[in-house]
Amino acid sequence: HSYAPVPLDGWDKSDTLVYTLPNSIPAGNYEAEIGIRYQESYPYRDIWLEVSHNTKDTLTYVTDTLQLFLVDEAGNKTGNGLCGLYQCDLPYKASIPIRTEGSARTFRIVHIMTDNPLTGISDIGIRLRKPENQ
């Protein structure tokens, strides 16, 4: 995982979290997950994110809109928690192509919730891994 911290006073809609992939990541298809660290005080069951990446063609960004649930219908928090801080890993893409040519390959994440700033989120992360069948 590569995590980016969210400002303590809240995540403003204009605050873009940027993750640059190291050149050491070999080309291929990867599974991608979004990691979310959130506080018990987070007021919603879900979070809406826009995730953009230029991993296939460094000149073109592809944008996905995600609704990720942090609390299930029974009110149980997803992931693991300790001392009021929870962490969960949620699927993003089953197969995302990563190419090595060109300039920096990056992911960009912004929230698209109505609250501005959005409070209760501590960190957002990206995790890439090779599928088990490769």
Protein language model annotation of sequence segments:
Residues P5-V6, D64-D72:
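Solvent-exposed serine/threonine-rich low-complexity stretches and specific carbohydrate-binding patches
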Residues I47-V62, L70, I124-K130:
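Extended low-complexity, serine/threonine- and proline-enriched intrinsically disordered segments
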Residues V18-G28, A94-T100, R129-N133:
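Extracellular and analogous surface-interaction loops
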Residues P5-D9, Y19-P22, N76-G79, K93-I98:
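Beta-strand-rich interaction surfaces with strong enrichment in secreted/lumenal proteins
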Residues H1-S52, D57:
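Start-of-domain marker
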Residues N29-E31, D46-E50, T65, A104, ...:
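Exposed beta-strand and adjacent loop surfaces of beta-rich binding modules
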Residues T16, L66-L70, T78-A94:
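A beta-strand/beta-hairpin structural motif
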Residues R99-N116, G120-K130:
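Internal, hydrophobic beta-strand segments that form the core of beta-sheet-rich folds
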